[in-house]
């Protein structure tokens, strides 16, 4: 099993067929998508959708390699994006010149394929506003998203380059929402493109309750609705129940952010902006903005991507008061004061390719596409012409912990910055050749990713769901160790790990479309040598210096501790000698004290006995005590003698019993039985005689 293809998808017939029909133009697109256990792949050559159950295909025996879903109508557009709906009932096939929706058939069978694994299935398809794109050759699709809260799982939002979002329900156009000034490809309106006023991306934030608008603003809204002939519809659609709006965050090319407030299926919209971005920056956080994504945290997190590789992480928060914005380029679009503000917390700069430092060239600019990880909300993926990055937004976990904390003294500290891991690199030289990412699909349970490159190579990797779930040796430390760690400083192992921590990632290098030239190989070698020198050898020198300092400190402490041990040994010997002398002195003093006590008692007795006023009873009592003492001593001596005699006799008795046991004569069994019977008869005879004697005595009266 290859380390870069754990699912062994390169050997499958599906990707062998995809490899033969890849697009010629090398630009980043997404021809892959995954919904539950089904992997969708667009075959550009045959204009059909290939489906494979990647989870069941992990088994040893696979009956069905893949299924082919043929559109019922001809798909003439160049598909660059495959997007399955939330419930997996529809698939949107999007390209620069149109959008096609394909209805997926029902699933049944042991492996969960469509129509019990039928190899080829014709699916109903319908194009969206085909005539609109034919009549407007400059019209292009910028973004396509399924509404996450559509009841029928069929609401599709399409952003066009004329600053409009078209809302479709299956094949029917429901609404057209204006998110900017109308764009015409003639006259002075071309300046909109120059000033970056075109919307490039949008995403849907979590639902919010509509605010109560001011009377003046309400009057202006009514006037605008009258112009659009929507007053009656708005009056009829005012239910008494509480309304819910979905903020749609729209990103323009110049970095300005607008918010379109509307319902899931509502004709009434409120465009707000440009939203104030804090802290202020001279480039407005992106003069070359190309992508936007919202992570549904609390508050929502906005990710803004620039084509130069910068990613801005910000929070979308409600403003304390509505902020009035400047007049729009076109007065035909009514823009309300913004109810939100965007606060940028950090900026992450991606490495767009690996190039040799000697060339002085960077990865250059290329569009960046964002894809959110549905399993881990702290992580998302950024893919581009130079490969794939996995970005972890750490402050979301801090926000969640702070919101869940019940302590009033808990403070919010967003000290941990985001981390960007370069997973796959497809550009590692200064040439203009590009091996773009043609598809990215995220797998669930087990978590993984599948990438399709322009060279036809398929990369399949397993992912850790959450890095915080990994057990580290630093976890489950006792409380006492924290105090000792504060006194002694960080562990030396952690210090070495921090010194060996590289500032750049070493991604997987993808295969090139052709064999590299000598110049490209030389650049790659120089880059590898530079990375080895800067990120490995230099850090090893730092580690060696740290080891030298640590060894010197340990030797110094060792010498000091040995000297202290010698001093303590001397002190111990002195203390032992003193303790021995004190013990002898104590025993001597105790013995002398006991003698003195005895002498004092004897003197007291003599003094009491020799007193002239001593009564006769006391003298007699003292004499009796002396006599009893002598008698007691004689009795004790006699008792001791009796004990010795008793022990001696018991010993002789035991010896005699052992001798009797040894010299005992055992009768034969027959004789023993005969004697036993005779004794039994004699016992019975004696009992009868005793009974007769008692009877006679009773008669006689004795």
Curated annotation (Swiss-Prot):
Q: What's an example of a GO molecular-function annotation for this chain?
A: structural constituent of nuclear pore
Q: Supply the alphabetized keyword list.
A: Chromosome, Coiled coil, Immunity, Membrane, mRNA transport, Nuclear pore complex, Nucleus, Phosphoprotein, Protein transport, Translocation, Transport
Tissue distribution is:
In the embryo, expression is prominent in a subset of the cells of the developing CNS, dynamic stripes of epidermal cells, lymph glands and intestinal tract including the proventriculus and foregut. In the larva, expression was seen in the fusion cells of the trachea, fat body, imaginal tissues, and with abundance in the proliferating parts of the nerve cord, optic lobes of the brain and imaginal disks. Expressed in the salivary glands.
| Entry's localization field | Nucleus, Nuclear pore complex; Nucleus membrane; Chromosome; Nucleus, Nucleoplasm
Return the GO cellular component terms, semicolon-separated. chromatin; nuclear envelope; nuclear lumen; nuclear membrane; nuclear pore; nucleoplasm
- Does the keyword section mention Phosphoprotein? yes
GO annotation (BP), single: mRNA export from nucleus
* Coiled-coil residue windows: 542-594
Q: What is its main location?
A: nucleus
> What are the Phosphothreonine sites (modified residues) in this protein?
231
State the name under which the record lists this protein.
Nuclear pore complex protein Nup88
């Amino acid at each position: 099993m290859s380390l870069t293809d754990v699912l062994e998808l390169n050997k499958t017939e599906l990707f062998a067929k995809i490899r033969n029909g890849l697009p010629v133009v090398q630009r980043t697109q997404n021809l892959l998508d995954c919904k539950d256990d089904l992997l969708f792949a667009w075959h550009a050559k045959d204009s059909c959708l290939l489906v494979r159950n990647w989870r069941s295909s992990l088994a040893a025996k696979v009956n069905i390699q893949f299924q082919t879903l043929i559109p019922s109508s001809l798909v003439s557009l160049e598909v660059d994006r495959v997007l399955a709906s939330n419930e997996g009932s529809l698939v949107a096939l999007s390209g620069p010149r149109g959008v096609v929706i394909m209805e997926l058939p029902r699933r049944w069978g042991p492996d969960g394929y469509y129509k019990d694994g039928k190899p080829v299935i014709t699916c109903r398809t319908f194009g969206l506003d085909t005539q609109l794109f034919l009549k407007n050759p400059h019209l292009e699709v910028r973004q396509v998203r399924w509404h996450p809260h559509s009841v029928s799982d069929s609401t599709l939002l399409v952003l066009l380059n004329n600053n409009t979002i078209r809302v479709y329900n299956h094949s029917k156009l429901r609404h057209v929402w204006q998110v900017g000034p109308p764009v015409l490809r003639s006259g002075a309106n071309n300046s909109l493109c120059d000033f970056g006023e075109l919307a490039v991306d949008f995403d849907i934030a979590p639902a919010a309750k509509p605010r109560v608008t001011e009377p003046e603003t309400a009057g202006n809204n009514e006037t605008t609705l009258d112009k659009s002939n929507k007053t009656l519809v708005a009056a009829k659609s005012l239910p008494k129940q509480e309304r819910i709006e979905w903020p749609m965050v729209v990103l323009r090319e110049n970095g300005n952010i607008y918010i379109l407030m509307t319902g899931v299926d509502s004709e009434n919209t409120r465009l707000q902006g440009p939203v104030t971005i804090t802290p202020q920056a001279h480039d407005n956080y992106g003069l070359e903005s190309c992508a936007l994504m919202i992570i549904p945290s609390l508050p929502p997190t906005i990710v803004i991507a620039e084509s130069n590789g910068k990613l801005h992480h910000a929070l979308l928060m409600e403003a304390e008061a509505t902020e009035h914005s400047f007049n729009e380029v076109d007065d035909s679009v009514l823009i309300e004061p913004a109810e939100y503000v965007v606060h940028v917390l950090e900026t992450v700069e991606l490495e767009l390719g690996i190039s040799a430092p000697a060339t002085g060239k960077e990865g250059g600019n290329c569009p960046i596409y964002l894809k959110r990880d549905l399993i881990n909300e702290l992580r998302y993926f950024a893919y581009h012409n130079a490969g794939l990055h996995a970005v972890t937004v750490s402050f979301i976990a801090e926000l969640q912990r702070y919101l869940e904390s019940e302590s009033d003294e808990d403070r919010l500290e967003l000290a941990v910055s985001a981390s960007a891991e370069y997973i796959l690199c497809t550009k590692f030289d200064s040439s203009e050749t590009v091996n773009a990412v043609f598809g990215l699909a995220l797998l669930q349970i087990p978590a993984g990713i599948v990438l399709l490159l322009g060279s036809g190579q398929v990369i399949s990797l397993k992912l850790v769901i959450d890095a915080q779930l990994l057990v580290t040796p630093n976890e489950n430390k006792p409380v006492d160790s924290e105090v000792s760690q504060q006194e002694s400083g960080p562990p030396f192992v952690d210090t070495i790990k921090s010194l060996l921590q590289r500032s750049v990632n070493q991604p997987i290098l993808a295969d090139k479309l052709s064999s590299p030239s000598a110049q490209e190989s030389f650049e790659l070698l120089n880059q590898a040598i530079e990375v080895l020198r800067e990120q490995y050898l230099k850090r090893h020198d730092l580690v060696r210096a740290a080891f030298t300092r640590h060894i010197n400190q340990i030797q110094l402490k060792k010498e000091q501790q040995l000297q202290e041990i010698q001093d303590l040994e001397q002190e111990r010997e002195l203390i032992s000698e003193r303790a021995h002398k004190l013990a002898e002195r104590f025993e001597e003093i105790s013995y002398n004290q006991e003698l003195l006590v005895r002498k004092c008692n004897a003197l007291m007795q003599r003094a009491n006995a020799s007193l002239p006023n001593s009564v006769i009873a006391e003298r007699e009592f003292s004499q009796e005590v002396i006599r009893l003492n002598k008698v007691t001593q004689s009795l004790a001596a006699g008792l001791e003698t009796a004990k010795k005699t008793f022990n001696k006799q018991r010993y002789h008795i035991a010896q005699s019993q052992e001798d009797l046991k040894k010299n005992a004569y055992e009768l034969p069994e027959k004789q023993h039985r005969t004697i036993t019977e005779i004794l039994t008869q004699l016992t019975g005879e004696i009992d009868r005689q005793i009974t007769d004697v008692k009877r006679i005595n009773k008669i006689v009266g004795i």
